[in-house]
Regions:
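Acetyl-CoA-dependent GNAT
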Residues: 1-33, 39-48
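Conserved catalytic-core motifs of GNAT/GCN5-like acyltransferases
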Residues: 55-58, 75-91
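Conserved GNAT acetyl-CoA-binding A-motif
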Residues: 48-60
Length: 96
């Protein structure tokens, strides 16, 4: 697991999975939304990951997060699953 922290306002966690990488979590406090913190953390993670395919799961109803991922080159691949934590529907985004 690899952890990135964003000035006590956010964090990103990623891990290598076979020949790709998974962004396991990306969170920021609402006060930091729109400040570029999420962009900076995601770009740093992608730089660390290098030239490998990357995937992540997002809550289907979280349109703000989905727009963020799409803005950064991720595309929904059509995969869906039910979250183990709260039963919410998640969709998979991929890049590369």
């Amino acid at each position: 697991m690899h952890f990135l922290m964003g000035e006590n306002s956010g964090m990103l966690v990623w891990q290598k999975v076979r020949n790709s990488a998974e962004i396991v979590a990306i969170h920021s406090l609402p006060d930091s939304w729109g400040t570029g913190l999420g962009h900076a953390m995601l770009e740093e993670a992608l730089n660390q990951i290098g030239n490998q395919p990357v995937f992540l799961w997002a809550f289907k109803e979280n349109k703000r997060a989905r727009r963020f991922y799409e803005k950064h080159g991720f595309r929904w691949d059509g995969s869906e699953r039910v979250s183990e934590f709260d039963g919410a529907l998640e969709v998979r985004y991929v890049k590369g």
